[in-house]
A protein has these predicted regions:
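Transmembrane alpha-helical segments in multi-pass inner-membrane proteins
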Residues: 13-104
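The feature captures the beta-strand-to-loop junction immediately N-terminal to the Walker
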Residues: 177-182
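Helix-to-loop junction immediately C-terminal to a conserved catalytic motif
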Residues: 195
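Conserved ABC transporter NBD signature motif
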Residues: 203-210, 222-223
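Conserved ABC nucleotide-binding domain
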Residues: 213-214, 278-297
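Catalytic Walker B motif of ABC-type/P-loop ATPase nucleotide-binding domains
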Residues: 316-320
Length: 396
C-alpha cells in the first residue's frame, strides 16, 4: 500500500536496518567499555530471543514499550531466580519453562504488549487541531477537456487466463468516468495496471503525455495519480489524521536525517494542517483524532478518499468508494466528487451501485469477461442491450 503513496519501502527498510545496526554497534561499544571484557555469551540465540521478547512484552508499537518490557523482564527474571530454588533444585530449568509459558500467554492474550493496558489508566493527552500553516505546494492541473489518461490495447494474463483483454479507453481532464461491469470483469485489475501495482503483458498507458506503462507505483504517485483500494488499506491503530498524513508524503521534501533530528517541524505542521483540512472536507473532522480501526467500514472508505486527496492528485482512482455507505453518505460522496470536478480533479471510479454511477459520471466504460463491452453516456449505456445482458443474462 505505501508504495502507492510514493513511499519507497526498500529505502525505509534499508534506513531502519542501518539505524538499528548503528544502535547495536554503539551498545556493543558501551558494553565493552563497561565490562572491559568482550564475550559472545550475551549475544547468543537465547539472549537474542530474550531481547526480542522485551520489546514484545512492553509493546513494540510504543516508544516506551522496549524500556517497560526490559524492566518487567529483568524484575521477573530476578524474582524467579530467588523464588524457584525454594521449590526445586533445578531452578534454572524451571525458569526456562516459566518463561516459555509467559511467552505463549503474552502472544496469545497481549500481542500489543502491556503498554496498551497501562495507557488505559493514564490521562489521555489533549489532542489539539494543528495551527494554521502555509499550504503545501500544489501541482498544476491540466486544462479541462485535454486528454489526461490514455489506455490502449491493455492485456494482462494470469497463467492461461486473460483477466484483461486488449482494453482501451481515454479519460479527459475534468471528467468523472465510471468503469462498471459484473463481478470478475477485470475492473480492479485495470486499476492495478494503471497505478503500477501490476505490470501489463501488452499495451500502453499514457498519463499527461508520459508513458507510465512500466513505471512503478512510486513514480506514478509522484506523477499525480492517487487511488483507493477495493479492500480498505489503512493503519487501524493510527488516528485518522495520521493516516491521511501519509498521503501528503509526495508533497514534502524533508529527508530521513532532517526528520530524525526534528528539523522538519515547519513542513510537518504544514502537512498536518493539510491532512486535517482533507478530513474535514470529507466530513470526518469531529473524529480526526480517533483510531481509524474504530470507524465503520463505509467511513473507512471515505477516509481513504481523504488520504488520496491529501496527495493533491490530478487523477484520483476510486475502487468501490460507495460500498458500505448509507444513502445520505452516498449523496455526500457524490457531492464531494462533483466538487472535485469543479476544482479540476479528474475522477475514475469502479462501483457496483449502478444508480450511484449513472447519476454521477460523465461517461461510462463497461467491461465483461476482461474486455471492453461498450463506452458512452450514462443514458445510452443503460439502454444498451449488451449491458443489460451482461448484468441480467440473456433470455433463452
Amino acid at each position: 500500500m505505501v508504495e502507492s503513496l510514493g513511499i519507497s519501502v526498500f529505502r525505509i527498510r534499508l534506513m531502519s536496518f542501518v539505524l538499528a545496526a548503528l544502535l547495536a554497534g554503539l551498545s556493543g561499544w558501551l558494553y565493552a567499555h563497561m565490562s572491559r571484557y568482550v564475550s559472545p555469551a550475551p549475544f547468543d540465540l537465547r539472549m537474542g530471543i530474550q531481547y526480542l521478547f522485551m520489546a514484545i512484552l512492553g509493546g513494540s508499537g510504543h516508544i516506551l514499550g522496549a524500556v517497560v518490557g526490559a524492566a518487567l523482564l529483568t524484575l521477573l527474571q530476578n524474582g524467579l531466580q530467588d523464588l524457584l530454588p525454594h521449590f526445586a533444585e533445578n531452578g534454572q530449568q524451571l525458569e526456562v519453562i516459566v518463561f516459555a509459558i509467559i511467552y505463549v500467554l503474552a502472544l496469545q492474550f497481549a500481542r500489543g504488549g502491556v503498554m496498551p493496558f497501562v495507557l488505559r489508566y493514564l490521562p489521555k493527552p489533549v489532542r489539539q487541531a494543528p495551527a494554521a500553516a502555509e499550504p503545501l505546494p500544489r501541482r498544476s492541473m491540466p486544462q479541462a477537456g485535454m486528454p489526461l489518461l490514455t489506455v490502449q490495447d491493455l492485456l494482462k494474463r494470469f497463467g492461461g487466463l486473460e483477466a484483461v483483454s486488449r482494453v482501451g479507453f481515454e479519460v479527459k481532464a475534468g471528467e468523472i468516468v465510471g468503469l462498471i461491469g459484473p463481478n470478475g470483469a477485470g475492473k480492479s485489475t485495470v486499476f492495478n495496471l494503471i497505478t503500477g501495482a501490476l505490470k501489463s503483458d501488452q499495451g500502453t498507458i499514457v498519463f499527461r503525455g508520459q508513458d507510465i506503462t512500466r513505471a512503478g507505483q512510486r513514480r506514478i504517485a509522484k506523477a499525480g495519480i492517487a487511488r483507493t483500494f477495493q479492500h480498505v488499506k489503512l493503519r487501524p491503530s493510527m488516528t485518522l489524521i495520521d493516516n491521511v498524513l501519509l498521503g501528503t508524503y509526495v508533497r514534502t521534501r524533508s529527508g530521513f536525517l532532517a526528520s530524525a533530528l526534528r528539523l522538519d517541524r515547519a513542513e510537518e505542521a504544514r502537512a498536518r494542517a493539510e491532512a486535517l483540512a482533507q478530513i474535514k472536507r470529507v466530513g470526518l473532522g469531529e473524529q480526526a483524532f480517533d483510531q481509524a480501526g474504530n470507524l465503520p467500514l463505509g467511513r473507512q472508505r471515505i477516509l481513504e478518499v481523504a488520504r488520496a486527496l491529501a496527495a493533491d492528485p490530478a487523477l484520483i482512482i476510486l475502487d468501490e468508494p460507495a460500498a458500505g455507505l448509507s444513502r445520505p453518505e452516498k449523496l455526500g460522496l457524490a457531492d464531494l466528487l462533483r466538487g472535485l470536478r469543479k476544482e479540476g480533479v479528474t475522477v475514475l471510479l469502479v462501483e457496483h451501485d449502478v444508480e450511484f454511477v449513472m447519476g454521477l459520471v460523465d461517461r461510462i466504460v463497461v467491461m465483461d469477461f476482461g474486455s471492453k463491452l461498450v463506452e458512452g453516456l450514462p443514458a445510452a449505456v443503460r439502454a444498451d442491450p449488451r449491458v443489460q445482458e451482461a448484468y441480467l443474462g440473456s433470455v433463452v
